[in-house]
């Protein structure tokens, strides 16, 4: 069965997961990502990795500053997605969006939940010298990273593991688990 997907993500970690979904039988309706930010001395506008990739594959992009508005609620209702997949979006979804009927909200989280709930789970696993971490696919509920875990995959952490290497590995695992 082909699903209509609303994708919500921002950093490079989310790109392989969006690619995997885009190359599947499912249809990406639209992508939500963080608004562009001004960077460096010249204050040049910089778009998120997800925004850039979405433009490459011609998927409409939306980057609201706030999600808890009537406009965003109406917009998401109008899209009629079957599922919203959230990957390091950087915004907490408001309850009124999570309560929309007929939409399942799924999160791809870079830890073996419940360990390292919240932001920076990869960094926290490395800083705490964990021997393993992993990726969790979970149903989103109003409390942060507290919904039921649907599937997990473990990943070993070695002494020479750094953030970039582990993040890339976890993103690839997430891109397979989400299907």
Would you name each region that the model predicts?
Residues 1-41:
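N-terminal Rossmann-like dinucleotide-binding module
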Residues 3, 24, 34, 83-179:
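Donor/substrate-binding cores of folate-linked one-carbon enzymes
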Residues 10-13, 65-68, 89-92:
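Short beta->alpha connector loops
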Residues 15, 19-23, 74-77, 95, ...:
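Amphipathic, non-transmembrane alpha-helical secondary structure
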Residues 16, 71, 117:
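Residues that form or flank phosphate/diphosphate-binding pockets in enzymes
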Residues 27, 58-60, 104:
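Conserved beta-strand segments of alpha/beta enzyme cores
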Residues 38-80:
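N-terminal glycine-/serine-/threonine-rich beta1-alpha1-beta2 phosphate-ribose binding loop
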């Amino acid at each position: 069965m082909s699903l209509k997907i609303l994708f919500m993500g921002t950093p490079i970690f989310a790109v392989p997961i969006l690619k995997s979904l885009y190359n599947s039988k499912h249809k990406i309706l639209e992508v939500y990502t963080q608004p562009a930010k001004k960077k460096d001395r010249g204050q040049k506008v910089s778009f998120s990795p997800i925004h850039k990739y979405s433009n490459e594959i011609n998927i409409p992009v939306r980057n609201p500053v706030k999600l808890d508005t009537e406009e965003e609620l109406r917009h998401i209702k109008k899209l009629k997605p079957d599922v919203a997949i959230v990957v390091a979006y950087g915004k907490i979804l408001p309850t009124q969006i999570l309560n929309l009927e007929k939409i399942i909200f799924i999160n791809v989280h870079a830890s073996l939940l419940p360990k390292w709930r919240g932001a920076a789970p990869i960094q926290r696993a490395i800083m705490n010298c964990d021997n393993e971490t992993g990726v969790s696919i979970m149903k989103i509920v109003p409390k942060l990273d507290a919904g039921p875990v649907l599937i997990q995959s473990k990943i070993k952490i070695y002494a020479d593991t750094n953030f970039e290497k582990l993040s890339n590995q976890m993103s690839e695992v997430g891109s397979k688990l989400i299907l």
